[in-house]
Every structure is written in C-alpha cells, then in structure tokens.
C-alpha cells in the first residue's frame, strides 16, 4: 500500500462502539471483528478522502510517535483488513 492510497470501509462495513460491552466492533456482512481502541482510531481516519500519508501524520502527532513506526503498523493492519475484504484502497 503506497502513501497515496485512500483507504475506506466498503459499503456495508461499519465501525461501531458497543457501549454496553465497552468495545469497538467492525461489522461486515455475516462477520464481526472486535478491534481495539488503537485500530478504531486508525479506522476512523479511513474515510476515502485522506491519503495514507495524512493518516500516518495525524496518528504520529496524536500519539507523539515516530512516523516510520506508525506507518509500518498502520500498513500492516490495513493490509490485513484489505485481505479480509473489510477495507478498500
């Protein structure tokens, strides 16, 4: 995935906060994925408008972390979700 990619959740896939259980879930047709707060923060930025470089920059600033470390983790996570067809680039 290159820096100009604009990741987004495909139609029918939703990120939701389950307030009763205090957890984030990624709801896809016939599948549910539990995601942690960090993954949810990444997915909230995947709106199809922001490029990957902008998402990484936002997260690096938010968490005061090196961009290269954030980028490696984000690319790995998004690649995994793309392989599961719950993310498009």
PLM features: what roles do these ranges have?
Residues 31-89:
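Long, charge-rich, low-complexity alpha-helical segments
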